[in-house]
């Protein structure tokens, strides 16, 4: 059976060869125009599928060049050049083709023609099985052609993206800056430790639940499709056990019963003062999801959370898998059937019992909101899809989509004026965002370091963090973002959740994180016939890592301790994967790349890792800094 994409926990190479003559009727110019536009669509689909399949990539998978720019497509997917014949696409030919594309799109973009050729390319490049190729092209084609029509990349930008900087400048996501108030920044004031006996709040953190309503015990966990362990996956070979009852260590999501087990078994970890829930409710079957499927997942899992958590307030954030097509989050100026109104309205209805009127108003507009859980604490839920590298709608305009960052500045300034503290929750971590968005966010965090008490994200499915530094020297740790592990097993992990201990609800509270605990379901034990699932404490951060506190400097120091202490790093590596690390060892390049990621809360900023190498060699540190595709 042919295999599509990559094996588990590896990057997904895309390959193929130049398309031969096609018998489709039409002028050669239109044929080539459709072919290259379809190639762009096929590559976008490859990105979407690999984004839904790749949890961890080797350190060498996505290096930065010595200049600090992301690797070009032909470097990220080297086989594309060899088999597709990428070298035959010269710079003049490329610019000529994209000139024809832009002229044609201004006249009459033919979605059906583009989709037909994209399906052929998807099959030719072996991006996915034929049925998946057909389904995902039909799902994406309308939005992708609409985005291309509205954005109309210049030939220089498109060919710079495809062939590298020698052919043109490809940074279509141009630089931009938000405005900060003229109010001077107060002197940095680290939080004081709470007094002995001060109240402590416990916050349950749920992320990346990924419910698969088609999960089926006994099916093939290593099928050819991007998601397995489900109806249609077939039976495994005799040498391989089928999908387990509670989940599987493979490219599989969770049955509803496992989410019910998680929520019903929270008692030993509680009680909880509130819940932060940072999205990704649907499964990774991104090639045939409908809006009805996404809304079903939203309402079903929201009802389940409400059933088991009762009166505990729950504050959600929007994940990248909530929409369909996956990662499709147009800014609010996109209206009509292409807009996200269908999703935001459904979220507002589902979450209305938890959110006040003003929060529901901005949720309906752009998927973000702010509220006050306690006196003195402001919670801000960001729609991180407006920073996403995979949100193709940002090709039209990536400058502060929905005005969200400028709105964030206003919220933080108002909190500073009141003397409040702020928690930020979101799905995609800031270090994984588009460069300009990420750098602006970094600047905002630095400006409001005294006000911003904590940041919480998900998305990567693994257990990590991102340290922020002062912008002047990049040496003083001033904030940390906590990236919690997923509930889903995707890919090859135990199910898990996080609990944060926070300086509690009292006058003068710092509201900072005091410690955190991670709980897992050991699938090896749970899937034994007749076993009762037991959610167990995996570790406590301060105890396990010997941290004096959980302030930014402590996490910075932990990274540099792990640089020289292999045993400590192996502990981190084990916990990073929720107690089920990959069988491949993490050697020195992998270790340094992983540590670099913990220092990189700002995208495309390899200088943050300049001290990781023993000799301080910046080029080497850059080459080890991965930006893998995550779910």
Swiss-Prot record:
<feature type="modified residue" description="Phosphoserine; by PKC/PRKCD">
    <location>
        <position position="510"/>
    </location>
</feature>
<keyword id="KW-0225">Disease variant</keyword>
<dbReference type="GO" id="GO:0009410">
    <property type="term" value="P:response to xenobiotic stimulus"/>
</dbReference>
<comment type="function">
    <text>In the lysosomes, converts sphingomyelin to ceramide. Plays an important role in the export of cholesterol from the intraendolysosomal membranes. Also has phospholipase C activities toward 1,2-diacylglycerolphosphocholine and 1,2-diacylglycerolphosphoglycerol. Modulates stress-induced apoptosis through the production of ceramide.</text>
</comment>
<feature type="binding site">
    <location>
        <position position="280"/>
    </location>
    <ligand>
        <name>Zn(2+) 2</name>
    </ligand>
</feature>
<dbReference type="GO" id="GO:0005768">
    <property type="term" value="C:endosome"/>
</dbReference>
<dbReference type="GO" id="GO:0005886">
    <property type="term" value="C:plasma membrane"/>
</dbReference>
<comment type="subunit">
    <text>Monomer. Interacts with SORT1; the interaction is required for SMPD1 targeting to lysosomes.</text>
</comment>
<feature type="binding site">
    <location>
        <position position="280"/>
    </location>
    <ligand>
        <name>Zn(2+) 1</name>
    </ligand>
</feature>
<dbReference type="InterPro" id="IPR011001">
    <property type="entry name" value="Saposin-like"/>
</dbReference>
<dbReference type="InterPro" id="IPR041805">
    <property type="entry name" value="ASMase/PPN1_MPP"/>
</dbReference>
<dbReference type="InterPro" id="IPR011160">
    <property type="entry name" value="Sphingomy_PDE"/>
</dbReference>
<feature type="disulfide bond">
    <location>
        <begin position="122"/>
        <end position="133"/>
    </location>
</feature>
<feature type="region of interest" description="Disordered">
    <location>
        <begin position="1"/>
        <end position="23"/>
    </location>
</feature>
<feature type="domain" description="Saposin B-type">
    <location>
        <begin position="87"/>
        <end position="171"/>
    </location>
</feature>
<keyword id="KW-0479">Metal-binding</keyword>
<keyword id="KW-1015">Disulfide bond</keyword>
<dbReference type="Pfam" id="PF19272">
    <property type="entry name" value="ASMase_C"/>
</dbReference>
<keyword id="KW-0597">Phosphoprotein</keyword>
<keyword id="KW-0551">Lipid droplet</keyword>
<dbReference type="InterPro" id="IPR008139">
    <property type="entry name" value="SaposinB_dom"/>
</dbReference>
<dbReference type="GO" id="GO:0007165">
    <property type="term" value="P:signal transduction"/>
</dbReference>
<dbReference type="GO" id="GO:0034644">
    <property type="term" value="P:cellular response to UV"/>
</dbReference>
<dbReference type="GO" id="GO:0005615">
    <property type="term" value="C:extracellular space"/>
</dbReference>
<dbReference type="GO" id="GO:0043409">
    <property type="term" value="P:negative regulation of MAPK cascade"/>
</dbReference>
<dbReference type="GO" id="GO:0034340">
    <property type="term" value="P:response to type I interferon"/>
</dbReference>
<feature type="glycosylation site" description="N-linked (GlcNAc...) asparagine">
    <location>
        <position position="397"/>
    </location>
</feature>
<feature type="disulfide bond">
    <location>
        <begin position="596"/>
        <end position="609"/>
    </location>
</feature>
<feature type="binding site">
    <location>
        <position position="461"/>
    </location>
    <ligand>
        <name>Zn(2+) 1</name>
    </ligand>
</feature>
<feature type="glycosylation site" description="N-linked (GlcNAc...) asparagine">
    <location>
        <position position="522"/>
    </location>
</feature>
<dbReference type="GO" id="GO:0043202">
    <property type="term" value="C:lysosomal lumen"/>
</dbReference>
<feature type="binding site">
    <location>
        <position position="459"/>
    </location>
    <ligand>
        <name>Zn(2+) 2</name>
    </ligand>
</feature>
<keyword id="KW-0325">Glycoprotein</keyword>
<keyword id="KW-0964">Secreted</keyword>
<feature type="disulfide bond">
    <location>
        <begin position="586"/>
        <end position="590"/>
    </location>
</feature>
<dbReference type="GO" id="GO:0046598">
    <property type="term" value="P:positive regulation of viral entry into host cell"/>
</dbReference>
<feature type="glycosylation site" description="N-linked (GlcNAc...) asparagine">
    <location>
        <position position="337"/>
    </location>
</feature>
<keyword id="KW-0443">Lipid metabolism</keyword>
<dbReference type="GO" id="GO:0046513">
    <property type="term" value="P:ceramide biosynthetic process"/>
</dbReference>
<dbReference type="InterPro" id="IPR004843">
    <property type="entry name" value="Calcineurin-like_PHP_ApaH"/>
</dbReference>
<dbReference type="GO" id="GO:0034480">
    <property type="term" value="F:phosphatidylcholine phospholipase C activity"/>
</dbReference>
<feature type="binding site">
    <location>
        <position position="427"/>
    </location>
    <ligand>
        <name>Zn(2+) 2</name>
    </ligand>
</feature>
């Amino acid at each position: 059976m042919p295999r599509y994409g990559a094996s588990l926990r590896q990057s997904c190479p895309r390959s193929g060869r130049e398309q031969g003559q096609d018998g489709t009727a039409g002028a050669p110019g239109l044929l080539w125009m459709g072919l290259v536009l379809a190639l762009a669509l096929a590559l976008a689909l490859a990105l979407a599928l690999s984004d839904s399949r790749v949890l961890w990539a080797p350190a060498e998978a996505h290096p930065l060049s010595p200049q600090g720019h992301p690797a070009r497509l032909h470097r990220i997917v080297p086989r594309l050049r060899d088999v597709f014949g990428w070298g035959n696409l010269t710079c003049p030919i490329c610019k000529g083709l994209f000139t024809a594309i832009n002229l044609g799109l201004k006249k009459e973009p033919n979605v059906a023609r583009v989709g037909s050729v994209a399906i052929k390319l998807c099959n030719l490049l072996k991006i996915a099985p034929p049925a998946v190729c057909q389904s995902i092209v039909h799902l994406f084609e309308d939005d992708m052609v609409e985005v291309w029509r509205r954005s109309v990349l210049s030939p220089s930008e498109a060919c710079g993206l495809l062939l590298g900087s020698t052919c043109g400048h490809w940074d279509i996501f141009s630089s931009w800056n938000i405005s900060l108030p003229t109010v001077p920044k107060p002197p940095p004031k680290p939080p004081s430790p709470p007094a002995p006996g001060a109240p402590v709040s416990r916050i349950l953190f749920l992320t990346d639940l990924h419910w698969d309503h088609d999960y089926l015990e006994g099916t093939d966990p290593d099928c050819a499709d991007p998601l397995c362990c489900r109806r249609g996956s077939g039976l495994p070979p005799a040498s391989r056990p089928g999908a387990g009852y509670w989940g599987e260590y493979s490219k599989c999501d969770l049955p509803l019963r496992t989410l019910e087990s998680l929520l019903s078994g929270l008692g030993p970890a509680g009680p909880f003062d509130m819940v932060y829930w940072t999205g990704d409710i649907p499964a990774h079957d991104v090639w045939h999801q409908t809006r009805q499927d996404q809304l079903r997942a939203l309402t079903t899992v929201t009802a389940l959370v409400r059933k088991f958590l009762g009166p505990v307030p729950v504050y959600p954030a929007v994940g990248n898998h909530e929409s369909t097509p996956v990662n499709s989050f147009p800014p609010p100026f996109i209206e009509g059937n292409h807009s996200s109104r269908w999703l935001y309205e459904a979220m507002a209805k589902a979450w209305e019992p938890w959110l006040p009127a003003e929060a529901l108003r901005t949720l309906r507009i752009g998927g973000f909101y702010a509220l006050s859980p306690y006196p003195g604490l402001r919670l801000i839920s960001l729609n991180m899809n407006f920073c996403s590298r995979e949100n193709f709608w940002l090709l039209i305009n990536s400058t502060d989509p929905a005005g969200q960052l400028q709105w964030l500045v206003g919220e933080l300034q108002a909190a500073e004026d009141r003397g409040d503290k702020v928690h930020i929750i979101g799905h995609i971590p800031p270090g994984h965002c588009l460069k300009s968005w990420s750098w602006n966010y970094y600047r905002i965090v630095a400006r409001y370091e005294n006000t911003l008490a904590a940041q919480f994200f998900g998305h990567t499915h693994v257990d990590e963090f991102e340290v922020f530094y002062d912008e002047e020297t990049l040496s003083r740790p001033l904030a940390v973002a906590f990236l919690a592990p997923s509930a889903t097993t995707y890919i090859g992990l135990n199910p898990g959740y996080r609990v944060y201990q926070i300086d509690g609800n009292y006058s003068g509270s710092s509201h900072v994180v005091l410690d955190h605990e991670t709980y897992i379901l050991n699938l090896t034990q749970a899937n034994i016939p007749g076993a009762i699932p037991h959610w167990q404490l995996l570790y406590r951060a301060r105890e396990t890592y010997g941290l004096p506190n959980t302030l930014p400097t402590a996490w910075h120091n932990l990274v540099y301790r792990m640089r020289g202490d292999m045993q400590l790093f192996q502990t981190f590596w084990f916990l990073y994967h929720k107690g089920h690390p990959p069988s491949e060892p993490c050697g020195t390049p992998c270790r340094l790349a992983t540590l670099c990621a913990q220092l990189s809360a700002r995208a495309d900023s390899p200088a943050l890792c300049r001290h990781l190498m023993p000799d301080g060699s910046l080029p080497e540190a850059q080459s080890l800094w991965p930006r893998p595709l995550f779910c």
